[in-house]
């Protein structure tokens, strides 16, 4: 089992503006394991970016304890490292942002090399390092291009290479794909996954998009108004969201709400027979491999008319979502519901026939 590389314990962050006190983060505890791709999701103003800046103490918390890679960096209201040790610790943490923050007058390779200006490497070693980093992010052929000559995705690749220049153990991505088109976003997420696998890099993803969490993360924390309201594996959160905000994020990411709107306009649903009901079936893991609807027809003579179906792969595990009309004798439908529950399927009745 991997150990926690980032431990944020009971973090409070308070700002004072004139006569107002703003509680940006309230008693948040997050532990992130080595090798995780960990998502922190929430709407603008939720406190997620403020929280993540305490990892490298770009933002000092008001209260709480921070441990990074085994070292306590902040406790009892004070930074626990010397200035030199803090600088070294920050080198272990790379950051990328929505706006790429590249220097317009420097080429791609010069932007990456800038991050090595305090490195103990020789000039030749630095040059080799820059070439290796640009190859790693798939941009070696653009080494001599200036930012103005690069697309948004290419600029972000340069920013990623620069963030990796000092061989960090942790990479923080603060809305790094927000300015990119969907195709480029997928390419950047695929690159981050590859870096996670190749380098054993721990990645913290700050985002307002649950789709990104679904595509890349293995664990997720949901924040609202400075409070962590839900946390767990992506599989658990998507399979069984407990909080209303989490459910809202997930329905947006899966498109189930939009599907239901269209389904409710269909004649079969508008005029549901007395011996039928509209149900949503959610299932995960081995349940997705079983011919469950065929099984309930054979056992209970309950037919299933599939109006919507979707299977996602979350952290290597298939997760299914289906909207069906179940039709049969009332007692048989009850028996079929029970059989589905016993097979690990969550059954929600959306409408009963009149």
UniProtKB/Swiss-Prot annotation:
It is found in: Cell membrane. SUPFAM superfamilies: ACT-like, P-loop containing nucleoside triphosphate hydrolases. The lineage of its organism: Bacteria, Bacillati, Bacillota, Bacilli, Lactobacillales. ATP binds at residues 42-49. The keyword Membrane applies. InterPro entries: AAA+_ATPase, ABC_transporter-like_ATP-bd, ABC_transporter-like_CS, ACT-like_dom_sf, MetN_ABC, MetN_ABC_transporter-like, NIL_domain, P-loop_NTPase. It comes from Streptococcus pyogenes serotype M3 (strain ATCC BAA-595 / MGAS315). Its EC number is 7.4.2.11. Keywords: Amino-acid transport, ATP-binding, Cell membrane, Membrane, Nucleotide-binding, Translocase, Transport. One of its GO terms (cellular component) is plasma membrane. This is Methionine import ATP-binding protein MetN.
